[in-house]
Amino acid sequence: MTTTPEHTSAVPLRVLDHNDIFRDEVYQKQFEGKREFENAAPKEEVQRVLDWTRGWEYREKNFAREALTVNPAKACQPLGAVLAALGFEGTMPLVHGSQGCVAYFRSHFARHFKEPVPAASTSMTEDAAVFGGINNLVEAMENITALYKPKHIAVSTTCMAEVIGEDLFAYIGAAREQEAITQDFPVSYAHTPCFVGSHITGYDVMLKGILEMLAKSPDADASKVAKSDKVRLNVIPGFDTYIGNHREYKRILELMGVDPLILGDHSSSLDSPADGEYDLYPGGTPLAEGALAKFSRASLVLQESTLRRTAEYIEKDWKQETVLLETPLGVKGTDAFLTAVAKVAEVEVPAELTAERGRLVDAITDSHAYVHGKRVAIAGDPDLVIALTRFVLELGMIPVHIVSTNADTTFKARMEKVLSASKFGEEATVWPEKDLWHLRSLVFTEPVDLLIGSMQLKYISREANVPLVRVGFPIFDRHHLHRFPIIGYTGGLHLLTQLVNTILDEMDRNDPDHSFELRRRSLIGAAL
């Protein structure tokens, strides 16, 4: 059977995906007919307006808006609460709200991690919005314990529940009274209104709620702490969607002779092996170990903006030493992390980690000819953006635009401190609470060589013809990046590899024939 290219979608047993099928002539004619029927603006007029939106006049209007947000680089609070819950053993996240919200959270994480994500909803509808959702919550808890048999339920809320003032503490008490759950069944909760804060706020308050519950449980008994020659340190990564980071924290501390307890460890729950057996609750911080966390020597809090409430709780209620650190990304960030661990635990930095540091420095030296002087724009969560900025400064790159939609009041001062420490930070402008439509104006009016951020930047990348290095959350359109660390010296090497190879790929695409070579050498290699 012979077919013409434009009709390949009609060939039996051959199904084209959306990338190809809508290029067929039949669909192209439909699109043109649709434009004509809708009396659409001429293509020339559309292009004129588009070009205008890329200029300085539109930028000024864009930055003058106050009552409109366009494409914010953030999600809502309960999404972060779900991730916090997934970091603990046998925990079922329960979101008090509509089914649609929970479907969004599950699909968002499933697309990023490529893993099934357990989460339940109280299925609030119009009736519950008017008369209250106590029956929904009680019934949900009864069904969850009967069907899914969790060890712990972590309850958060959506905007529907918050607008009508749902009282989680009272509702959970009612569930116990009505024997939907037993009197001693572990339930933590946090109020996570969607209309304030962001996913990092939700992560923080849910983690705090879980730790409060564990600290009051029967397992929170100092006599149950196992005897060990190793110092135990709590490590709190925060809203960190890099599975590889969690494993790297454990590896680093174990190399230093420290017993690490990751509080909120989703490295197994969101990266379980395909071994033929399905486990609804793989991994997570053991609840019994979490209950003993308040007896650790100290807590290392690795996201200052994200974990502010959790850090305050640990310091004030547990009376525990709380060490606030920037995310240990790059040479300086990892140096500070290892120095803090060595000081608190009274241990030495082993030779293996010193060698890893040397390899990262060597790799930076090898690649500096290609990364040095490149102008970059960075967008994402505040703690990650600060760490990324510090790393690109180490590489001799020039951060020009720094955007964080969900930045807190301390973000700008913290960022300016990082920028002022390097001559490469002199051109940078910090934009807290701005969205990706603002970033689009910035990139067109003050061009850059590279974008660094989540997949949400891909539209700017394509329109402005600027390559994107995907770092952060969410990343649906590339696979397995979250499985590798970006923290520590090893993670820094992974991130450097992404950066320099993206630049080299772009050079290959644009090189004239006389520069299109098989070997790309560093200056050191060329000299040798």
From Swiss-Prot:
In alphabetical order, the GO MF annotations are: ATP binding; iron-sulfur cluster binding; metal ion binding; nitrogenase activity
What Pfam families has UniProt attached to this entry? DUF3364, Oxidored_nitro
**What is the cofactor note?**
Binds 1 [8Fe-7S] cluster per heterodimer.
Q: What class of enzyme is it?
A: oxidoreductase
One biological-process term from Gene Ontology?
nitrogen fixation
Which EC number(s) are documented for this chain? Answer: 1.18.6.1
Further comment: Cys-194 is present instead of the usual Ser that serves as a ligand for the 8Fe-7S cluster in the oxidized state.
> Which family does the similarity line name?
Belongs to the NifD/NifK/NifE/NifN family.
Assembly:
Tetramer of two alpha and two beta chains. Forms complex with the iron protein (nitrogenase component 2).
Q: Which NCBIfam families match?
A: nifK (TIGR01286)
PANTHER family linked to this entry: LIGHT-INDEPENDENT PROTOCHLOROPHYLLIDE REDUCTASE SUBUNIT B (PTHR33712:SF7)
Q: What is this protein called?
A: Nitrogenase molybdenum-iron protein beta chain
Source organism: Frankia alni
